[in-house]
Curated annotation (Swiss-Prot):
Keywords: D-amino acid, Disulfide bond, G-protein coupled receptor impairing toxin, Secreted, Signal, Toxin. Moderately activates human somatostatin receptors (SSTR) with a preferential activation of SSTR1 and SSTR4. In vivo, does not cause behavioral changes in mice within a few minutes of intracranial injection, but causes a progressive loss of movement thereafter. Four to five hours after injection, mice recover, even with the highest dose tested. Shows antinociception and antihyperalgesia activities in two mouse models of acute pain, most probably by acting outside the central nervous system. GO terms for molecular function: toxin activity. Disulfide bonds join 72-77. The modification D-tryptophan is found at residue 74. Residues 1-18 form the signal peptide. Belongs to the conotoxin C superfamily. Consomatin family. This peptide is an evolutionarily optimized stable analog of somatostatin. In addition, it adopts nearly identical conformations as in the somatostatin drug analog Octreotide. As this drug, it contains a D-Trp at the same position, whose synthesis is a common strategy used for enhancing the metabolic stability of compounds in drug design. Consomatins evolved by gene duplication of a 'Somatostatin and related peptides (SSRP)' gene expressed in the snail neuroendocrine system. It comes from the Eukaryota. This is Consomatin G2. Its main location: secreted. GO terms for cellular component: extracellular region. The cysteine framework is C-C.
């Protein structure tokens, strides 16, 4: 999701960047981007996880529920019952 956000942001910057009189597109874009923004910083922000995500994972991993497993989808994890167990059978076939 963060990657899509950055791609969309950079596309908007390229489209809406004001060009100075006789200037190049890069000079207009450089005026909109902070000086400390480097490719390394951008990649680090895309790869690293937020502190709240790490804390949430720690609490989820330490509190298991009976007959449930940890179901993770796109960095959001919840405890859910096993999908192949039907509740109406009560353990009988």
């Amino acid at each position: 999701m963060q990657t899509a956000y950055w791609v969309m942001l950079m596309m908007m910057v390229c489209i809406t960047a004001p060009l100075p009189e006789g200037g190049k597109p890069n000079s207009g874009i450089r005026g909109l981007v902070p000086n400390d923004l480097t490719p390394q910083h951008t990649l680090r922000s895309l790869i690293s996880r937020r502190q709240t995500d790490v804390l949430l994972d720690a609490t989820l991993l330490t509190t298991p529920a009976p007959e449930q497993r940890l179901f993770c989808f796109w960095k959001s994890c919840t405890w859910r019952p096993y999908p192949w167990r039907r509740r109406d059978l009560n353990g009988k076939r």
